[in-house]
Amino acid sequence: MEEPFLPQDEQIVPCKATWKSGQLNVELKKVSRLAVPMATVTIAQYLLPVISVMVAGHNGELQLSGVALATSFTNVSGFSIMFGLVGSLETLSGQAYGAKQYEKMGTYTYSAISSNIPICVLISILWIYMEKLLISLGQDPDISRVAGSYALRLIPTLFAHAIVLPLTRFLLAQGLVLPLLYFALTTLLFHIAVCWTLVSALGLGSNGAALAISVSFWFFAMTLSCYVRFSSSCEKTRRFVSQDFLSSVKQFFRYGVPSAAMLCLEWWLFELLILCSGLLQNPKLETSVLSICLTTATLHYVIPVGVAAAVSTRVSNKLGAGIPQVARVSVLAGLCLWLVESSFFSILLFAFRNIIGYAFSNSKEVVDYVADLSPLLCLSFVLDGFTAVLNGVARGCGWQHIGALNNVVAYYLVGAPVGIYLAFSCELNGKGLWCGVVVGSAVQAIILAIVTASMNWKEQAKKARKRLISSENGLA
């Protein structure tokens, strides 16, 4: 017999403990215990392609240019979609675990993996023709050839993501972050050895770098799969209910599509930024500097992503359990962590603004330009961290559609036009483009803050219950 969705009286449980009675301190500890390992896991996953790019780059400028172009194209057309779709499981699996509907977690996870596979097939077809597509778009034929060859060998990585990402959310929803951490770090060490072997020892160049990513991600997928299959920690949650499969697929796409829109709209904006920088007066300088700023911002962003994943998990768990007040305190705890980390890294970046550019370039002009943009980059650190946490709240509650609409308004109706106007009409060049990003992030932050502050948490818990019941009854 199944566990009840909510307590016996079917009423939302009022939480007597609030931030006044120390609940905030308790939540800070719980969110931190999830956030730190998840941030580390995200960094480890981010470093896999970075290491391959670094190793391939030592084989010449052509190899580096081709790999960089392929990385950009595959991120936009494939990996962003995979990362976005799996955001639905933060809602579904997290709330199911909180409601003690453990068998639903396995069904949701297997449904997500099954749904991802045909999407990967469609994306793979696009990647197969990447070389011809890039040439038709006016890219250099030699660079396009390297990029196309690299993308072909990344196709297995795409299918590995179809397994890794749902299993990651499956474990995260249960708070099983330490196994994730161990497997991610092991995979990173494994990747370094494989990448060196294929690229340097066997002399496979950029193709070897791409193959190394594929081998490493499949290693990660297999280790996670074995843990989920054989670990006693997943005994209750790995079960599959076949009659719920179709309804779970519908639920996956219902929340996955707007979740993917949330992420893709943000990723695509930065690719648009780089494209626009190539149209400025000094395209080599502007593109180099904006690429450095984007890389720096991305490296920092993995930390707020870890906090957001933790907040999303706590919020979804507590809404599923019918304890909305604790979910609310989890949001406050996440914002406290955001304030500390964004302040620390912003101060650190500003203090070293005159030398950070040397980590990427020996050009004094580039280094000085990066230093000039550092105050804006510091502001991006603050805003990106804030929006990351609140986007985590959105995924935990299940209102990804609001997040997607917010990104359209903030980035494409406000941020991008402002950036293009400042860059070209006001001749602020790269600084103008980044100002547009900051303005867009500010609008996004304001809208998310208003929505979160006005949220009826008891109503969100009731919606979580209805979501689970509709899934049980085979409704989407």
Curated annotation (Swiss-Prot):
One of its GO terms (cellular component) is membrane. The chain crosses the membrane at residues 35-55, 66-86, 117-137, 154-174, 176-196, 208-228, 260-280, 289-309, 332-352, 370-390, 408-428, 433-453. GO terms for biological process: xenobiotic detoxification by transmembrane export across the plasma membrane. Keywords: Membrane, Transmembrane, Transmembrane helix, Transport. Coiled coil: none annotated. The keyword Cytoplasm does not apply. One of its GO terms (molecular function) is antiporter activity. It is found in: Membrane. InterPro entries: MATE_euk, MATE_fam. It is a multi-pass membrane protein. Belongs to the multi antimicrobial extrusion (MATE) (TC 2.A.66.1) family. NCBIfam families: matE. This is Protein DETOXIFICATION 4. It comes from Arabidopsis thaliana (Mouse-ear cress). The gene is DTX4.
